[in-house]
Amino acid sequence: MAASWRLGCDPRLLRCLLGFGSRRSPELVKGAARWSVGRGASWRWFHSTQWLRADPIKILMPSLSPTMEEGNIVKWLKKEGEAVSAGDALCEIETDKAVVTLDASDDGILAKIVVAEGSKNIRLGSLIGLLVEEGEDWKHVEIPKDTGPPPPAAKPSVPPPSAEPQIATPVKKEHPPGKVQFRLSPAARNILEKHALDANQGTATGPRGIFTKEDALKLVQLKQTGKITEPRPTAALPTTPAAPLPPQAAATASYPRPMIPPVSTPGQPNVEGTFTEIPASNIRRVIAKRLTESKSTIPHAYATTDCDLGAVLTARQNLVRDDIKVSVNDFIIKAAAVTLKQMPNVNASWDGEGAKQLPSIDISVAVATDRGLITPVIKDAAAKGLQEIADSVKALSKKARDGKLLPEEYQGGSFSISNLGMFGIDEFTAVINPPQACILAVGRFRPVLKLTQDEEGNAQLQQRQLITVTMSSDSRVVDDELATRFLESFKANLENPLRLA
């Protein structure tokens, strides 16, 4: 950046500051830099252009969601040399949730695009571009050598052990000549050990030479009929004295295993039994990681009930006559929000030490997109009316499918709802979306004949429209008794739409 100073002082003082002697010329030209000292004026000035250039502003890969670790550059919206104002869209970044626009935080000129569009798996904190101030020579901006993310904090060094541990060499089991080493199934191994039989006395009939349970049972029958004798005990093999092994050899040393032909051969898609690897997007990888963590770390419990939608369908028809379009799913969201307001203990999460009740009722609604499942959030759903919920769901679902959700539109949430009724699914169980404690799985509504009584007590068959809902809950936060009471209240609220007003 060109920098200039105006100094209102005597030229002799400037000469001293610049290191000039009294006999030096008041003007000095060296390379592309120029100093000059004016004479006969009320002010003096000093100007430098090359030696005081500011460093460019770094544009780093930002963290656009709590679970984001990497990002993809989908498209650059500005070109090199183009002026940028604070708030202008610089580029589109695909996160683990959606495609988000990165806005500029400073005014200037986009000098360098360090990471081209289409680049994938860019770590957080990596340099993706450089910005300079207006008037700078943006064409000659140098790219820093270190463009990667900052290194993690150094861990305290652990002193090496005083002596190398001695690892005994594993003794290889020698097989007598003429014997074949079979691969035993667990059941077959148990039977052979129980009856003191040797697999070499029989024949392996399993796939790829596996000695199966049936093969072991045949040996037992032959032994019982006297057609085979028990194997003679062999002399114990001499053992080798313990000797130290290098770490790599110690890690790979094991008993020999029979050679098994591979099930598939990568790289040959036309060969039977092979596969084609499908590249996973950031969203797919994060979904897989979070689902695995959820099922392996959260104790899931399930509770199921049926709800009669007769009153909801009637109320929906009445609203349509007034040109108010709401779906059955909007009624379900509203019923869940009202129930959470009545039972705030369910509107909670587990923070590692205990349950934490959440202040706002924010409903996450699962939306299927080409990039995977994403859950936009209906903020403060208990305070919204049916029409507001319907409008929010439509707008957020469209943005989710277009990949235009903002981070604040899918982050957070205190309770999730996943509805597969439109796909003809009667009922299912869903995986909890951490750190939330519950998710409600909703199936399709279906006609069912039920035996009821009229006002006079006479039995009669009536057709009812039922849906099955299953709540998955974190047992650390919502126990079975609390989950049961929640579903009872949810059912009562949904079957009586007037309670939702």
Swiss-Prot record:
Residues 56-132 form the Lipoyl-binding domain. InterPro entries: 2-oxoA_DH_lipoyl-BS, 2-oxoacid_DH_actylTfrase, Biotin_lipoyl, CAT-like_dom_sf, E2/Pdx1, E3-bd_dom_sf, PSBD, Single_hybrid_motif. Residues 1-53 form a transit peptide. The modification N6-lipoyllysine is found at K97. One of its GO terms (biological process) is pyruvate decarboxylation to acetyl-CoA. Required for anchoring dihydrolipoamide dehydrogenase (E3) to the dihydrolipoamide transacetylase (E2) core of the pyruvate dehydrogenase complexes of eukaryotes. This specific binding is essential for a functional PDH complex. Gene3D superfamilies: 2.40.50.100, Chloramphenicol acetyltransferase-like domain (3.30.559.10), E3-binding domain (4.10.320.10). It comes from Bos taurus. This is Pyruvate dehydrogenase protein X component.
